[in-house]
């Protein structure tokens, strides 16, 4: 049953998402890092099955506390953040100031959660329903795109774009943008949804 599948991109073991992405992409600016976190979190939530999130994932919580010269993060700091079960409170605490610092991300994830919890198209209860209504488009190698459609009473087009370049849709004028992590898009409405792009 789909409700027995738990999807996650961050849990209490190993690095949290922010710290993992910072380790893999150390030269990313804050905006790029934030968009990566939003993309991974949105993918996690909108997949069929149960979505699991760790506290602070939506506002870029970090466990990397620099103890080196001038507050630099040392290898020991990285190892402690990766396996923090016995680390001091300074590492495991939640910095609630990040909530307001990353309010746009919090609002974006809130909209994604609203889609997941109010639209059955993102939470089918049987594999038969998924097979009947969810269509994953074939991706081109190294495109950075995952595209799927959900066709039921409503038709949703979901595009996850990690390519770093805009993706052009044919017949885009016939689509309604429901939610996007592109800050230039105004997407305050999540009611009366017809299509969805990320």
What are these regions (language model features)?
Residues 165-185:
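Beta-strand-rich binding/interaction modules
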Residues 186-198:
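C-terminal beta-strand-rich structural cap/linker in extracellular carbohydrate-active enzymes
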């Amino acid at each position: 049953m789909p409700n027995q599948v738990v999807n996650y991109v961050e849990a209490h073991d190993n690095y949290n998402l922010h710290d993992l992405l910072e380790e893999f992409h150390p030269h990313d600016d804050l905006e790029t890092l934030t968009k990566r976190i939003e993309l991974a979190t949105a993918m996690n939530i909108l997949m069929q099955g149960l979505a699991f999130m760790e506290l602070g994932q939506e506002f870029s919580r970090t466990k990397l506390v620099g103890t080196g010269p001038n507050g630099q993060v040392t290898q020991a700091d990285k190892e402690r953040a990766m396996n923090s079960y016995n680390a001091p409170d300074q590492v495991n605490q939640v910095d609630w100031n990040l909530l307001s610092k990353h309010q746009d991300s919090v609002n974006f994830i809130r909209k994604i959660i609203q889609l997941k919890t109010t639209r059955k198209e993102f939470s089918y209860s049987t594999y038969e329903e998924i097979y009947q209504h969810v269509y994953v488009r074939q991706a081109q190698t190294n495109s950075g795109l995952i595209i799927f459609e959900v066709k039921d009473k409503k038709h949703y087009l979901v595009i996850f774009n990690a390519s770093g370049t805009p993706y052009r849709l044919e017949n885009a004028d016939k689509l309604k943008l429901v939610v996007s992590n592109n800050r230039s898009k105004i997407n305050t409405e999540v009611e009366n949804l017809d299509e969805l792009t990320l």
